[in-house]
């Protein structure tokens, strides 16, 4: 696949040569910590948004974790077992590998809906296997991850 593919319909800069276009980039944003959190995935081949979730009260790390799990589950559902996932959060990637969200967010009536989603994600991780590469997006070398919300 050409990098970037000539049919990309967005204004994202060309991908770094080390980055495969057969991939989704996922990222989260949170206004405050905790605060309103949301996440999304962008298809690197087309620049199209694959999914978006939120906002709901949470933390950035939780959003990054859930974005990766959401991408894994959707890819598995679509039979895309080799598509790469890029994410810029070392913690989230580690949590997915350990199949557990190690958040310190206080569990309160306000955060309970998010905790239910976290439990569902952990249950999915513990009952499924995947072969999709999950790769740390190297922001210092490559610039912001294409799924970035641009709020810094």
For each feature predicted by the language model, list its residue ranges.
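Alpha-helical metal-binding/catalytic segments enriched in His/Glu/Asp
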Residues: 67-69
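RNase H-like nuclease fold core
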Residues: 2-62, 74
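RNase H catalytic domain
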Residues: 30-33, 73-151
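Short intrinsically disordered terminal tails
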Residues: 1-2, 152
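Flexible, glycine- and charge-enriched loops at secondary-structure boundaries
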Residues: 57-61, 65, 107, 111-114
């Amino acid at each position: 696949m050409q990098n970037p593919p000539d049919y990309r319909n967005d204004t994202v800069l060309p991908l770094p040569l080390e980055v495969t276009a057969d991939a989704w980039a996922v990222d989260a944003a949170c206004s405050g910590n905790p605060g309103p959190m949301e996440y999304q995935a962008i298809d690197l081949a087309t620049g199209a948004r694959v999914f978006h979730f939120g906002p709901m009260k949470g933390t950035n790390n939780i959003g990054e974790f859930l974005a990766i799990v959401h991408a894994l589950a959707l890819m598995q559902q679509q039979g895309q077992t080799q598509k790469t996932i890029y994410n810029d959060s070392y913690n989230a990637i580690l949590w997915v590998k350990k199949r557990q969200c190690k958040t310190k967010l206080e569990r309160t009536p306000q955060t309970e809906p998010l905790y239910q989603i976290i439990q569902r994600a952990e249950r999915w991780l513990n009952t499924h296997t995947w072969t999709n590469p999950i790769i740390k997006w190297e922001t210092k070398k490559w610039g912001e991850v294409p799924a970035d919300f641009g709020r810094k």
